[in-house]
Every structure is written in C-alpha cells, then in structure tokens.
Amino acid sequence: MTSLSPYKIVNFFSIEATTTLTHRVLKKVELLSRVFDHSTSKYLKGFRLLTLGWSDGNSFSGIDFALLSSAKEKNRYNEINPGIDKRTCGYQRRKEAITKSTKLLEPMVKNAIKIGIQAKYLVMDSWFSIPSVISTLRNHIHIICMLKDLPNWLYEYKGKKLRLKDLYGKLKKKRGKAKIKASVLVTLPDGKKARIIFVPCDKKRGWLALLSTDISIADEEIIRLYGKRWDIEVFFKMCKQHLKLVKEIQIRNYDGLIGHTSLVMARYNILTLFQRESVDQRSFGDLFRACNEELASITFIDALKRIMQLAMSVLRKAHNLSETIINSILDLIMGEAIAYFGLNNSPMPQLKGDWG
C-alpha cells in the first residue's frame, strides 16, 4: 500500500545510560560500585543502566539493556560471586557489567539487527560520540549524535585535522536567528565522510554540534531525529518514578537485579503497546495519516473562514439581526484576528462578502 503521508516515518534506535541507586543498607549487593552520575556530577553507590531502545517517532520500546558496575576494580565495593558457573548466562551478564559501556554498544546493536528489528539510524548523546566508536557502529547502522569539543577528537576539513571549536571558526555562519548556523562535510579518522551541523544554543559558546554519518539527509531532518532522543529520557523517568525501578526490591543477588530490571522494561513496553492500540489514533495507520493530511491541508485562513461561517449561521438562527449588521460584526472580528496574527501585509484571499 502506498503511504498517504507526505512525511516519511523513520524507525531508529536510541541508546543512553542512567544511574540506578540501591537502598543504602544493602552494601553487600554483588558488583555494587561507585558510578558517576552526570546529572549531579557526583559519584554515587549503585549501577548504570545502559539501555537500547527502538522508536518510530511516536512510540518507544526498550529492547536491550546492560546493568553496569564499574570497569575499574578500585571503584567496585564487591566483586563477582566466585560460586557462579562461568558457563552460564548469569556469569556472562556479570562480565558485561564490568566492561566499558562503549565496548557494549556494537554487540547490542548487532543483536537487535540480528533478531530482525528494523531501524535506519542510531541516535546517541555526546557521551558515546567518540570518533572511534562512531567508526565502529557505522559499519552496521547510520549514526546521529551530539558532539563534544575535546582536543583529541579531530575532524578533517580541507586537508587539516581540527577540533570542533576550530572547525566552527573556519566556517561561514548564517546571520540572524537562523536555526542552523553552519553545515559542513568532514572526514572522520576512518577516512569516511560525515556531516556536522552547528545549531545555536544558550550556552556560553553559543552553539551545539550534531553529526550524521548519512550525508544524504537534510540538516533539518538531522535536528528532528536527534530531538526524538528525548523519548528515552521519558522512558527512564517513567521507569524510576512510576514503575518502581529498584525501589520495590531489596536484593543482594545480581541475577535478581537483572530479573527485576527486565520486568520493569516489560511493563513499560506493555503500557506502550496498550497506549498505541487503545488510545493513540495513530494505530489506525494510513487511515489516520489520510485524515491528518486532510486537516493539515486546510490553511489558517480557510479554517478561520469556516469558523466565521458557523458563527454567522448561529447568529441568523438565534437573533433577529439584519444581514448588514451580521456582516459588519464578522468583518470586525476578521480584521482584528488578522491584525492579531500579524497577517496584515500577507497576500490574502478576498473573504469579505463571502460568508454565506
């Protein structure tokens, strides 16, 4: 069936990590460690939940996770239970817990693709946008991510390897309140091309940088898709505040923590499916998009005209007013509305006298 929507629906993966805390008294939790919480910029006792999710821009589902301790032995309060059989999945999970998060990104993405989950992009925050990681992941899927300005993260432009702020200084910027200040094609350390766009922000330096390994898409689409990464932040908030992630258990066993996290993620996915099928009209698919397209095709002036026609019909039925008075009232309202929305100087269709 041919899609009735003028906008292409893009499926994508999103990956992010958040800090999960254990109860203060459970100091003997297996693999408990000091983990850095980026939101508070402090070290806390607990784990980091690295999550891979899937989204079509409307619904989000968690599809894989790793419950991470610290890769540094000095930051771990407790080690792996020596009684665990090394041939079991539980032991593999424990080995995964003491692996750097950047080393887990590729196997998580490969496993998701292997089981048949379709996505065109992987959207990431700046914590994972290391050039070497991007080069590894782009062998499997296109990457869209925010970039950090670090001295050893270099991008080749016109034969010179530049850090991000130096690259920005070389580019011609758009003036005024442009949504995109600059856009450029660069070469990554692996020799492959990527697009970097700079957008304005309120930070001291005045810009943020986004990278896409797919150089065929528009700059505006890169911004739109990166903005959809917010869904995974909502996922974490829902799991912590409403689905009782970590809060409903007191357990020392690492397998128990994995099982609990799996159940919380399953609850969220069930709620997402229920909302999509029972509440969200987008579950009607192309029928919804056809109706939505019809609504979008009505211009502001056409919509306002229809409202005025309805108001005129009500006035005729409810009050004994002459056509001259009714038209004067509607002309006054229309004039005020046009002035309010700043459309005085815009080309307008002649609506006066055409209210019937």
Predicted regions and their residues:
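Single, function-defining residue in the core of a domain
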Residues: 27-28, 59-61, 68-356
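Active-site-proximal, Lys/Arg-enriched surface segment
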Residues: 1-72
